[in-house]
């Protein structure tokens, strides 16, 4: 019966399981109203909830249309069987509102992997963007991934086009890649391919941003797949394509509907969009999208419909409007995530609110999205039947197949705020952080909610709660953050709280792992469990061991524990570990490890060494790996000082090498390293290897690497490496040596004998054989044939077997000195095979057999010769005892009191003799009983002198080698050195007593004597067997001058009274403090106290000092430096850990801060405490605090700062002025204002510091009667406003009645804005900032006019004088070079920085940018004509040049400088051919920022100046080049340059532009132009090559300059070779490497020995180099040449002048004698002829 009913139901309801967009079944409430038409009573029989449902269902009837009765009839049937079955369909459940429990069972309150079926749609935020996909996070912290192919159709088409391009360009890409690999390196070949490919893919960060909201649809959930297909990791794959997530009918596209859009194209006023709906296109205006300029075709975003017309939709991205909600839908398919809807509240429980949307789809708002966790509060806040405005965040399918919703009422979700809240949340409390005190806020079906503080909430999943003992005070740990829910994800489970790290990404790079469990071993690496099995890690093959293991499984057993270190953790959380001892056992303080590029930069800046591993070999070097997954490149040239052809020959894969970093470029992901040591260390290594004597030198080394058969060692602090072969580890058998090799640890210190060395490769061989070491110490180990030939045949010699052959055993004493043992002298029987009986490096004892003096060869024997026993020598008796009572050795024993004679008095002991053959010593601690007995505390033994006889007591023996006290254990003999005491108490006592550690107590007072100093400690001798250590800070005498040398304050042997602070029984000494020492603390230190402090750290701004007793103080830079011109590093670098005197400036006991001064009383830079210590015009020292856009702030002291505005920084115009001033830079300035501490200003202008201070006047400074020049600011009907010069933007009004004596009619006809005028002040009103001016001529008296004229003339004269001084200074500079003729070069060899602005064009009133170029041109023209003639004095030529320059400077300058356009035009009428006037006119326009007018003037000048005036035209062209270089573009400069080359001499124009580039510091441009000029004129012009060489050497490119010399010799004809080489040699002497210059000159004088002028120039350069010996040697060589008498006279005079300047009287006489001898010899030769 039941079966038939079900069958019939299926037939009657064929559409019952179809799409739910069909008309819903009629509610039972509706039928009830039809059946009961007239209910009793006047009120409605329905509850408010039922009324709301009726209204919703009526709306749905209208929405779907009431087509026929058939649709309603079958819908009513299931009601009859509602109670007979629990498995009702979704429509049945929707129709049944009475069974609320059953309805709630179909709801989904939380999202998890099990509820996200394919087709589920969600609203989420982008939480991460990678190269391959987007990571989108939803509610409850679940994340999914969007692949590149599921973004949009437009984006997919971009990928398809890219794929086609990649296929077509494969060959080109391969070729390009090979070129790149030749030029530089990448990390590995595999990574190359990945990087190349990923670099070509579109960068998703340009299309999307973190925090962006998107609607997504699930296309794959691996956790729901069958077990056969199930992957190891759960992963949700999503699509955000509009066609997949926008499920709308035409009727649903109404205002406020959220819609996902993809950008199709960018238009002028907006972007066209793809909305994924057939027949519809979208549009968004520019103004409606925040960063429209960043919008790209293919990008996807969530929009809000604002308008719909026909087939187009207009959207925006504003979701903040509270009215943005949908009120109608065409079907339930339109209810999708992202929409704002009204949820009809049906039930309220402790888990949240359940209800319906549009009366069709059930939904729930969880308590975490209501932020109300109590059921009572929920019922108080919300009422059943009310509507709640929510946004849908998930649309899922329940087990019955029904559509259910998860909604949110959180404000940030309603507004869709773009900020990703997890960023801020995890910045505050990162993953792994533990909250100690949390309170329970509430709970629902899956989560426990905790209150972390007033603002933050967290939730704990039921699986991570654990056992809660105290619910009021919980500890929880952060596991993550859910940005959509705005809530922390926590765990209260104790096992999570105890973990050190929660994720592998939290494990720091370089972490030492003491106990790693091996889980598998293979050739591809080792798998480990770390942190007690919490994480897995892998060991790459190259990091298994320092030595290559063929069978790693033999050494590393599964289940065993090993020690490792984390080398990297990749983005997926995979941990890589190294087991190499060289990396595992490295201490943090030994070598810093590279783990990040920032870390690498710090290591490079500090010039420190680090460790790297050889990863891959390349032809031009090898790729090395660091920690953190970083790779670097080690070029062949940097592997070793010797030439390296193939890196495999010098290194091996997986080898750990110590490197220095040459270049770190984080942007290019590039690190260049070197194994080569620095030049200083290379020199040190060279000296060390040369000083090593094989067979004699014993050194201490550290083990840095182990191989199968040897140990690699290194000399500390030198870096020289050597090898100890396993056979040389001891004299024992090879088996024992191999066992010893295994026990050796990296870093172990060894002492051994060098037996061989290679000075070329700087490598040595060592031996640890004790037999060889002992012989070497005794110097009995033979090194040469002479050491062997005279030995007796019974003398044993220790050696080792070098090699074995048929001839016998070749036995070596060191690597080069070898003898032969014949087989018959090696073994007893010929049947024994010596190759099996012996092995290489075996220790042997040999005896001399035969020698061959002729060939210096010798034979040895392993068999000892038979020798007769010698008779035992009888020991002699005691000789000449000092104490006559001593007759024999038996009279001397422990406790004996005897007389002794002082042999010598040392600072800390008395050396005595008891007999002629018996010596002893009295330690200073055994002289005095008490401190008071000592008269001279610094030299206690000064009262004793040589040959004094003293009474002493024998207390023990003294070990001469170890300098230690030894008890007497055998009979005293002449070999003994006795330890004696002369203490009065000891002489009286019958017992022998020496103060030892056992009888010392803490607090006991002792007398100690300084034995030595070590760093910041003194070592004291308390007794011969007891030492004490005392810190300098713990000495009682705080007045000690610690700035002096410690040895002078506490000399050796000086006496101190100390107290025992602690006892170090392990090392056998006591720690002491001064007797009157008081432990300092914050409460005892007062301002003004002078305390000793130990320098701990030098920072950029301060010095940190240790005052003792864990009290530290800080000395600010202005309180630390005696001279501000030094940096803290320069002043205190050599004082780190030294104790220096300090003065307390302030004590902040609350913040535990002490400020100190390190400045002496007579500091070079005076102390400034407030503005009262300053006065205007005073010059002060300062240190730059910081730099901002308005100027720089300067420290004058710790509390006083000053400000320097940009206008006061420099006399020159500095375009990029900020790069000239850095924090903590020293500056010298002059005080401008100092009214208050907060209003101190300085000027750094050199002209104002050295001259008068130009203080701009303000309204309050101006008085009636003052005369000013100014500029017309504006012209009105009632007067003109004038901006006054030399004021702070002061403007005054000249009324129309004060313009002229006769009132003008039209002011605009007389004046224009910018005209220059002179005005007199009539009256001022500073309060209102008003000034009345007059321009009337009658107001200016004759005296005023005269004064003004005088002032103007004086100013002009000063300018001329300054210019003249500059030119004279330059000329004088050249004149100083004239003796060596280097001043005649086209290129000045000395530092030639021109006194012009850095831009190449100065707009100052002086206007010097044309004349200086003109001077330069004249100098170059004249220099080409000069020849190297040593006999001609050329100073007159320079003098004439100076006069010409001055004359050019003053030509055509009137007594009054032109001040307007009219003035210049008037000047041009009289001087149309004067380039100076034209250029001044151009400069005037440039001052007014009229650049285009300046260009027009230049063109006018070229047309106006007569064609014969080439020099004047040249000046205009140069001015145009200057103008375009400063104010134009590259194109305009190139155009002017090309034209100038056509009209003027091309070479001259090239050289002028080169000069302009250098002056304006455009060095790259200059380098390019040098190359082009040399190519064009290099075959005929020597000067261009010299200029190019000068340019390169000036910029520290000496090697490139030497290449240029080679190119010059190829390009120039042979006749010019000597000249160009000579000039390059002069350049090397002046700016480069003088040794290189000498080499060039030596080559010249060798090729042309008769060119005396070359010898003259050579001498001049050596004189400038100030190497007296070389100058004298050169003169000696010259006078031996065949030279004329005139030339000889010249050189002798020159030599004599040199020696007189040196003041060497002895050499002066020698030169005179040499000259006399020369004259005499030539006179005799002449007479003979």
From Swiss-Prot:
GO terms for biological process: 90S preribosome assembly; endonucleolytic cleavage in 5'-ETS of tricistronic rRNA transcript (SSU-rRNA, 5.8S rRNA, LSU-rRNA); endonucleolytic cleavage in ITS1 to separate SSU-rRNA from 5.8S rRNA and LSU-rRNA from tricistronic rRNA transcript (SSU-rRNA, 5.8S rRNA, LSU-rRNA); endonucleolytic cleavage in ITS1 upstream of 5.8S rRNA from tricistronic rRNA transcript (SSU-rRNA, 5.8S rRNA, LSU-rRNA); endonucleolytic cleavage to generate mature 5'-end of SSU-rRNA from (SSU-rRNA, 5.8S rRNA, LSU-rRNA); maturation of SSU-rRNA; rRNA processing. InterPro entries: HAT (IPR003107), NA-bd_OB-fold (IPR012340), Rrp5 (IPR045209), Rrp5_S1_rpt_hs11_sc8 (IPR048058), Rrp5_S1_rpt_hs1_sc1 (IPR048059), S1_domain (IPR003029), TPR-like_helical_dom_sf (IPR011990). Residues 119-200, 338-410, 510-580, 607-676, 690-769, 794-863, 895-971, 1003-1083, 1088-1159, 1177-1245, 1265-1336 form the S1 motif domain. Residues 8-21, 173-182 have a biased composition (Basic and acidic residues). SUPFAM superfamilies: Nucleic acid-binding proteins (SSF50249), TPR-like (SSF48452). CDD domains: S1_like (cd00164), S1_Rrp5_repeat_hs11_sc8 (cd05702), S1_Rrp5_repeat_hs12_sc9 (cd05703), S1_Rrp5_repeat_hs1_sc1 (cd05693), S1_Rrp5_repeat_hs2_sc2 (cd05694), S1_Rrp5_repeat_hs6_sc5 (cd05698), S1_Rrp5_repeat_hs8_sc7 (cd04461), S1_Rrp5_repeat_sc10 (cd05706). The modification Phosphothreonine is found at residue 47. It holds the Pfam family HAT_PRP39_N. GO terms for cellular component: 90S preribosome; nucleolus; nucleoplasm; small-subunit processome. Residues 22-31 have a biased composition (Polar residues). Its main location: nucleus. Present with 8860 molecules/cell in log phase SD medium. Involved in the biogenesis of rRNA. Required for the formation of 18S and 5.8S rRNA. This is rRNA biogenesis protein RRP5. It comes from Saccharomyces cerevisiae (strain ATCC 204508 / S288c).
């Amino acid at each position: 019966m039941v079966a038939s009913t079900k069958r019939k139901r299926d037939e009657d309801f064929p559409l019952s399981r179809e799409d739910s967009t069909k008309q819903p079944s009629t509610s039972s409430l509706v039928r009830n109203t039809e059946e009961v038409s007239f209910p009793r009573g006047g009120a409605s029989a329905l509850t408010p909830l039922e009324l709301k449902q009726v209204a919703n269902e009526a709306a749905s009837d209208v929405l779907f249309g009431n087509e026929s009765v058939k649709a309603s009839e079958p819908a009513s049937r299931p009601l009859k069987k509602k109670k007979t079955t629990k498995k009702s369909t979704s429509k049945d459940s929707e129709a049944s509102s009475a069974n609320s429990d059953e309805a709630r069972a179909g709801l989904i309150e939380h999202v998890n992997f099990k509820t996200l079926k394919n087709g589920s749609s969600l609203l989420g935020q982008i939480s991460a963007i990678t190269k391959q996909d987007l990571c989108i996070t939803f509610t409850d912290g679940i994340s999914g991934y969007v692949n590149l192919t599921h973004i949009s159709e437009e984006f997919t088409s971009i990928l398809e086009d890219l794929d086609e391009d990649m296929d077509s360009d494969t060959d080109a890409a391969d070729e390009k890649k090979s070129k790149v690999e030749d030029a530089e390196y990448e990390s590995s070949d595999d990574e190359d391919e990945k990087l190349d490919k990923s670099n070509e893919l579109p960068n998703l960060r340009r299309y999307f941003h973190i925090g962006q909201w998107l609607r997504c649809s699930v296309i794959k959930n691996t956790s729901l797949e069958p077990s056969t297909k199930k992957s190891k990791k759960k992963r949700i794959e999503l699509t955000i394509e509009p066609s997949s997530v926008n499920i709308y009918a035409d009727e649903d596209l109404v205002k406020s509907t959220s819609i996902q859009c993809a950008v199709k194209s960018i238009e002028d006023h907006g972007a066209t969009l793809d909305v994924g709906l057939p027949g519809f296109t979208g549009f968004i205006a520019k103004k409606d999208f925040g960063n429209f300029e960043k919008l790209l075709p293919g990008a996807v975003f969530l929009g809000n419909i604002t308008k719909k017309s026909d087939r187009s939709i207009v959207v925006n991205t504003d979701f903040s409007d509270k009215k943005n909600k949908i009120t109608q839908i065409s079907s339930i398919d339109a209810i999708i995530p992202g929409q704002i809807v009204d949820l009809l509240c049906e039930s309220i429980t402790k888990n949240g609110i359940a209800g319906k949307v549009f009366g069709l789809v059930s939904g729930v708002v969880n308590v975490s999205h209501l932020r109300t966790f109590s059921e009572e509060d929920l019922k108080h806040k919300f009422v059943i039947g009310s509507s709640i405005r929510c946004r849908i965040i998930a649309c899922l399918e329940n087990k019955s197949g029904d559509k259910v919703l998860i909604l949110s009422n959180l404000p940030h979700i309603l507004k869709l705020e773009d900020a990703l809240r997890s960023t801020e949340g995890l910045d505050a409390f990162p993953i792994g952080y533990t909250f100690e005190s949390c309170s329970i806020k509430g709970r629902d079906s899956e989560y426990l909610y905790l209150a972390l503080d007033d603002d933050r909430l967290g939730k704990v999943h039921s699986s991570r709660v654990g056992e809660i003992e105290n619910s009021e005070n919980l500890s929880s740990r952060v596991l993550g953050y859910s940005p959509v829910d705005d809530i922390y994800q926590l765990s209260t489970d104790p096992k999570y709280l105890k973990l050190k790290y929660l994720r592998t990404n939290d494990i720091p790079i370089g972490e030492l792992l003491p106990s790693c469990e091996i889980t598998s071993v293979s050739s591809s690496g080792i798998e480990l469990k770390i942190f007690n099995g919490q994480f897995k890690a892998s060991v790459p093959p190259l990091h298994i061991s320092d030595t290559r293991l063929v069978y790693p499984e033999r050494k590393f057993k599964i289940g065993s524990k090993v020690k490792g270190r984390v080398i990297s953790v990749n983005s997926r959380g995979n941990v890589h570990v190294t087991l190499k001892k060289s990396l595992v056992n490295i201490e943090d303080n030994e070598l810093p490890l590279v783990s990040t590029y920032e870390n690498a930069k710090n290591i490079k800046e500090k010039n420190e060494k680090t460790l790297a591993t050889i990863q891959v070999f390349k032809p031009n070097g090898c790729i090395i790996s660091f920690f953190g997954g970083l790779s670097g490149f080690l070029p062949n040239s940097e592997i070793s000082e010797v030439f390296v052809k193939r890196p495999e020959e010098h290194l091996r894969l997986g080898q750990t090498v110590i490197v220095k970093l040459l270049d770190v470029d984080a942007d290019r992901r590039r690190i260049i390293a070197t194994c080569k040591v620095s030049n200083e260390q290379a020199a040190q290594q060279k000296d060390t290897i040369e000083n090593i004597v094989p067979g004699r030198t014993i050194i201490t080394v550290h083990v840095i690497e182990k191989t199968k058969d040897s140990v690699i060692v290194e000399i500390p602090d030198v870096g020289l490496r050597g090898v100890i072969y396993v056979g040389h580890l001891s004299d024992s058998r090879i088996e024992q040596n191999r066992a010893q090799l295994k026990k050796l640890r990296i870093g172990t210190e060894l002492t051994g004998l060098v037996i061989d060395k290679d000075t070329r490769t700087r490598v040595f061989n060592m031996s640890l054989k004790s037999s060889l070491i002992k012989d070497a110490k005794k110097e009995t180990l033979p090194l040469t044939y002479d050491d062997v030939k005279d030995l007796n045949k019974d003398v044993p010699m220790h050696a080792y077997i070098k090699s074995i052959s048929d001839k016998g055993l070749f036995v070596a004493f060191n690597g080069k000195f070898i003898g032969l043992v014949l087989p018959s002298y090696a073994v007893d029987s010929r049947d024994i095979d010596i190759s099996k009986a012996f092995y290489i490096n075996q220790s042997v004892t040999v005896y001399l057999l035969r020698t061959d003096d002729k060939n210096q060869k010798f034979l040895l024997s392993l068999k000892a010769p038979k020798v007769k026993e010698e008779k035992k020598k009888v020991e002699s008796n005691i000789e000449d005892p000092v104490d006559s009572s001593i007759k024999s050795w038996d009279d001397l024993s422990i406790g004996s009191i005897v007389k002794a004679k002082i042999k010598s008095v040392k600072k800390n002991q008395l050396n005595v003799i008891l007999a002629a053959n018996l010596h002893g010593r009295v330690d200073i601690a055994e002289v005095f009983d008490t401190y008071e007995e000592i008269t001279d505390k610094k030299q206690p033994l000064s009262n004793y002198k040589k040959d004094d006889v003293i009474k002493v007591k024998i207390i023990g023996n003294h070990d001469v080698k170890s300098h230690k006290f030894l008890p007497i254990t055998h009979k005293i003999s002449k070999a003994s050195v006795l330890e004696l005491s002369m203490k009065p108490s000891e002489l009286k006592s019958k017992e022998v007593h020496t103060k030892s550690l056992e009888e010392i107590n803490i607090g006991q007072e002792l007398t100690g004597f300084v034995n030595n100093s070590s760093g910041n400690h003194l070592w004291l001798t308390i007794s011969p067997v007891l030492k004490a250590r005392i810190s300098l800070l713990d000495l009682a005498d705080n007045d000690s001058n610690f700035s002096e040398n410690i040895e002078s304050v506490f000399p050796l042997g000086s006496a101190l009274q100390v107290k025992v602070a602690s006892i170090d029984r392990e090392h056998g000494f006591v720690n002491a403090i001064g007797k009157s020492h008081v432990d300092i603390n914050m409460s005892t230190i007062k301002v003004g106290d002078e305390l000793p402090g130990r320098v701990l750290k030098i920072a950029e701004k301060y010095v940190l000092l240790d005052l003792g007793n864990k009290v530290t103080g800080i000395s600010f830079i202005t309180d630390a430096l005696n001279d501000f011109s030094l940096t803290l590093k320069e002043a205190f670098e050599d004082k780190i850990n030294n104790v220096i005197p300090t003065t307390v400036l302030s004590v902040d006991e609350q913040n535990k801060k002490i400020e100190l001064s390190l400045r002496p009383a007579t500091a070079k830079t005076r102390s400034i405490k407030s503005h009262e210590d300053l006065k205007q015009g005073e010059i002060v020292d300062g240190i730059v605090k910081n730099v901002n856009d308005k100027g720089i702030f300067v420290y004058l002291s710790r509390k006083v700062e000053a400000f320097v505005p940009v206008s006061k920084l420099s006399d020159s115009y500095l375009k990029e002025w900020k790069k000239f001033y850095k924090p903590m830079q020293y500056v010298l300035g002059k005080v401008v204002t100092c009214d208050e501490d907060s209003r101190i200003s300085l000027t750094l202008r050199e002209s104002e510091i050295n001259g008068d201070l130009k203080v701009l006047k303000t309204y309050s400074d101006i008085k009636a009667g003052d005369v000013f020049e100014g500029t017309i600011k504006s012209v009105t009907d009632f007067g003109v406003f004038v901006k006054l010069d030399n004021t702070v933007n002061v403007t005054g009004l000249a009324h129309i009645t004060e313009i002229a004596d006769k009132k003008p009619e039209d002011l605009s006809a007389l004046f224009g804005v910018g005209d220059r005028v002179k005005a007199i002040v009539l009256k001022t009103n500073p309060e209102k900032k008003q000034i009345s001016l007059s321009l009337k001529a009658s107001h200016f008296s004759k005296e005023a006019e005269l004064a003004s004229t005088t002032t103007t003339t004086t100013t002009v004269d000063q300018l001329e004088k300054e210019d003249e001084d500059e030119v004279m200074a330059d000329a004088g500079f050249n004149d100083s070079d004239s003796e060596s003729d280097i001043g005649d070069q086209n290129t000045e060899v000395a530092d030639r920085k021109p006194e012009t602005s850095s831009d190449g064009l100065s707009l100052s009133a002086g206007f010097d940018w044309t004349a200086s170029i003109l001077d330069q041109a004249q100098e170059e023209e004249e220099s080409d004509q000069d020849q190297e003639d040593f006999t001609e004095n050329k100073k007159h030529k320079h003098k004439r040049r100076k006069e010409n320059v001055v004359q050019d400077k003053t030509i055509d300058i009137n007594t009054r400088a032109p001040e307007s356009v009219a003035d210049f035009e008037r000047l041009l009428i009289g001087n149309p051919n004067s380039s100076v006037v034209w250029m001044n006119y151009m400069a005037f326009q440039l001052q007014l920022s009229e650049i285009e007018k300046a260009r027009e003037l230049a063109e006018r000048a070229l047309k106006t100046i007569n064609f014969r005036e080439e020099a004047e035209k040249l000046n205009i062209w140069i001015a145009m080049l200057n103008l375009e270089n400063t104010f134009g573009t590259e194109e305009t400069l190139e155009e002017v340059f090309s034209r100038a080359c056509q009209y003027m001499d091309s070479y001259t124009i090239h050289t002028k532009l080169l000069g302009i580039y250098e002056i304006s510091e455009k060095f790259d441009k200059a380098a390019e132009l040098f190359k082009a000029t040399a190519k064009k004129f290099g075959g005929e012009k020597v000067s261009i090559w010299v200029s190019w060489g000068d340019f390169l050497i000036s910029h520290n490119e000496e090697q490139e300059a030497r290449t240029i010399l080679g190119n010059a010799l190829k390009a120039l004809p042979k006749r010019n070779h000597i000249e160009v080489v000579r000039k390059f040699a002069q350049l090397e002497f002046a700016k480069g490497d003088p040794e290189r210059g000498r080499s060039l000159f030596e080559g010249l004088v060798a090729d042309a020995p008769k060119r005396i002028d070359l010898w003259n120039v050579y001498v001049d350069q050596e004189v400038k180099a100030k190497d007296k010996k070389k100058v004298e040697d050169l003169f000696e060589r010259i006078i031996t040449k065949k030279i004329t008498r005139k030339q000889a006279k010249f050189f002798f005079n020159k030599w004599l002048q040199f020696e007189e300047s040196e003041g060497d009287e002895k050499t002066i006489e020698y030169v005179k004698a040499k000259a006399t001898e020369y004259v005499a010899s030539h006179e005799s030769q002449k007479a003979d002829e």
